């Protein structure tokens, strides 16, 4: 960016072009640092350079000292191409280092920088149709409705998801945007969409500090939105949660009054009996890679303890029952070779590892600092658990988990291959054996149960299938569908998202209430909020709320009643 009165110059040719490394290394004087920071506000190329160079210190932690120094030219086994800049050289050497490491998972991994690539050529599907982002925020009041909104639905329906602000980068790591509706007295009072304005929203913050520790304020907050102890939290699993208001404005990072020095999973579990919120943090370079936390019904953090896992695995979800907490240690591991040679937003830095034993870790809720028991299972990966519950019978005590299971995940790249299907795991606490059985062969994702029955034997679970919602009767092991096809049998559009159950006031029956979901119509390129009567799941929706804009595909959300 030229100074006032100066002609345009080629990128990198201005007066500040050589200041980036000195700034990152802390070598600028106070006056020069302030001048350079003022310049960064308006100069994209310098901001990108600083973001790139910030990765150098964590990268060095991956390498032996002799790997950083230029190799002996006589050593033909060291194939490091001539590189004009330090970072490229370090990347090349680090790639070689990870390739020859005898035990790559013992390396200290460092996530790459926020430098982006052209996702149109790498992940074209994530920029077309309903994966395309929307580019502004709006508010609309008194939305048109087809049908009738049940008068007792008074509250907010909120859903979070990635909404990239540029044409670059993987869709999954786009900035979080919450789409919300306020329902009251049979009206759709308002619709709002708002970005979650984290501290790294305007000025990207590297996810790791120079010493390899995590920067918990570096967040895109794009995965889930939950309410607990009077606070609404936007979540992304490698950072602190961010609190938002009832009007969806960002209030700031939330660390439980300074007590939480860890990230928070995007899938916390709120016990319907005690009101406690259970969650874990993951993503630490150093051990412990995972820690378990518990907050009481008033939002006070009461328990924090490490969970012993041997490597930095991708742990996205976990399970809570009346008596137990269950963690999944599955063979999808952080791969430093991918992390230091690929942009994080181009290729997610996790790879399948055949040598890592898949297992489930069980912790008693009444002994939160006690020993975990580990149970081996067949290799697989699970993003989402539908539900879990305890069983006591003549054959012994057990824990049942109903999960959406992939046979494997990301062996060679972070492209999605096989679909997930519904499976049941039964952990026999007496014999130590896990019984694994497939319940259905349909490809489904984003399962939900009635949240009031989380941790107990809920009868119904609803998941997203191909052009349909699939409801499983988990007592009878049967399924029915609410289809959104083009055959005219239903007038709703064709692509539903996660369905959230909103119970009827004063009713405990799982069929007394409604499923809420955003549904995308590819013909009109628009979206509706669809309300389905749980007692007439296959029938027409009772209401379709016409939204003023398309709601892109996203992840998770919740119904928050008054």
Give the ranges of each region predicted by the language model.
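Positively biased amphipathic helices and basic secretion/translocation or surface-docking motifs
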Residues: 1-15, 57-110
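Short, amphipathic alpha-helical interaction patch
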Residues: 1-47, 59-62
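Surface-exposed flexible segments
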Residues: 16, 40-43, 53, 417-419, ...
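Class I S-adenosyl-L-methionine
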Residues: 37, 54, 358-361
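Detector for the c-type heme attachment site
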Residues: 48-52
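Beta-propeller domains
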Residues: 111-562
């Amino acid at each position: 960016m030229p100074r006032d009165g100066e002609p345009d110059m080629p990128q990198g040719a201005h007066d500040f072009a050589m200041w980036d490394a000195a700034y990152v290394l802390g070598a600028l004087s106070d006056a020069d640092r302030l001048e350079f920071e003022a310049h960064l506000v308006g100069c994209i190329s310098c901001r990108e350079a600083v973001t790139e160079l910030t990765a150098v210190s964590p990268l060095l932690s991956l390498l032996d000292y002799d790997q950083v120094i230029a190799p002996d030219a006589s050593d033909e086994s060291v194939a490091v191409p001539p590189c004009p800049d330090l970072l490229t050289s370090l990347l090349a050497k680090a790639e070689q280092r990870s390739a020859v490491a005898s035990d790559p998972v013992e390396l200290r991994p460092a996530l790459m920088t926020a430098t982006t690539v052209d996702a149109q050529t790498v992940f074209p599907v994530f920029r077309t149709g309903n994966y395309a982002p929307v580019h502004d925020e709006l508010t609309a009041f008194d939305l048109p409705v087809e049908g009738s909104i049940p008068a007792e639905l008074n509250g907010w329906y909120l859903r979070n998801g990635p909404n990239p602000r540029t044409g670059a980068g993987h869709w999954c790591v786009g900035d979080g945007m919450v789409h919300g509706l306020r329902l009251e007295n049979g009206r759709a009072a308002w619709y709002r969409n708002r970005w979650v304005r984290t501290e790294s929203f305007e000025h990207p913050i590297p996810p790791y500090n120079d010493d390899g520790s995590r920067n918990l304020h570096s967040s895109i907050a794009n995965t889930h939105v939950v309410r607990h102890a009077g606070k609404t939290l936007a979540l992304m699993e490698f950072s602190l949660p961010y609190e938002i208001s009832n009007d969806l404005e960002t209030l700031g990072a939330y660390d439980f009054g300074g007590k939480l020095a860890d990230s928070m999973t995007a899938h916390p579990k709120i016990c319907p009996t005690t009101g406690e919120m259970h969650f874990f943090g993951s993503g630490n370079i150093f051990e412990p890679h995972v820690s378990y936390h518990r907050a009481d019904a008033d939002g006070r953090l009461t328990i924090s303890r490490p969970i012993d896992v041997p490597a930095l695995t991708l742990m996205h979800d976990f399970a809570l029952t009346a008596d137990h907490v269950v963690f999944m240690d599955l063979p999808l591991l952080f791969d430093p070779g991918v992390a230091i040679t690929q942009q994080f937003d181009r290729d997610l830095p996790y790879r399948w590892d055949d040598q890592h034993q898949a297992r489930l870790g069980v912790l008693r809720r009444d002994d939160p600092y006690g020993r975990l028991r580990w149970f081996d299972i067949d290799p697989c990966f699970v993003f989402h658990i539908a539900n879990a519950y305890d069983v006591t019978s003549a054959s012994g005590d057990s824990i049942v988990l109903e999960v959406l299971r992939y046979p494997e995940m990301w062996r060679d790249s972070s492209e999605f291959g096989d679909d997930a299907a519904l499976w049941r795991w039964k952990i026999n606490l007496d014999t130590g054996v896990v019984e694994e059985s497939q319940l259905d062969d349909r490809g489904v994702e984003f399962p939900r149960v009635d949240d009031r029955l989380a941790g107990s034997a809920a009868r119904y679970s609803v998941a997203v299938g191909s052009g349909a919602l699939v409801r499983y009767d988990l007592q009878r092991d049967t399924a029915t569908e609410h289809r959104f096809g083009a055959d005219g049998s239903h007038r709703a559009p064709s692509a539903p998202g996660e369905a959230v159950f909103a119970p009827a006031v004063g009713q405990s029956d799982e069929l007394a209430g409604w499923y809420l979901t955003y549904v995308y119509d590819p013909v009109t390129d628009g979206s509706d909020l669809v309300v389905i009567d749980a007692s007439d799941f296959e029938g027409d929706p009772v209401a379709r709320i016409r939204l003023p804009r398309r709601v892109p595909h996203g992840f998770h959300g919740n119904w928050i009643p008054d």
